[in-house]
Amino acid sequence: MTKSEFAFIALPISALVAPSTFAAQYLTVDQAQRAIFPGKSLTAAPVKLAPAQRKAIEQASGVRVLHDEQQVWRVSGGGWFILDEVVGKHEFITYAVGLNADGSVKQIEIMDYRETYGGQIRDQNWRAQFAGKTSKSTLKLDRDIKNISGATLSCRHITDGVKRLLAFYEIALKH
């Protein structure tokens, strides 16, 4: 096989494989739980949403609910750990939100990032903007949460996801 024949075959194959090489798992569920709630015990408490709850969350947040079941853990001493996914530009971003006992955001962690660009959303300073936000916060990109150039869709969708999870807390978790 000549070099040109090899290049003719290898180039299309590499184009198919290349996008997947940008996917990165930064944290497992256990690692994210320890990062957000160090030294705390967490108990799985998945929530299956009733149609009325799903509709109420969508109305309260203005964000579509993609799944009827939400992966949730109750934190000893109060608080919640919620695992979620949003679509970045083309691929899913898996992230976790830690909520304090009062329902305010304690911390968010980006666990899996599969997009080619926009990984800057993992930056601690960007993620820290969510701390203290509640369901009463407006959570608008470019107003409450600063955008990152080159990561606009990832920023917008994480912001929308957190807003949806805060509404989820109010409707499905708060007692």
Q: Which sequence ranges carry the predicted segments?
A:
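Flexible, solvent-exposed loop/hinge segments and secondary-structure transition points
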Residues: T21-I148, T152-R156, D160-H175
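Bacterial N-terminal signal peptides
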Residues: I9-A18
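Bacterial N-terminal signal peptides that target proteins for export
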Residues: M1-I9
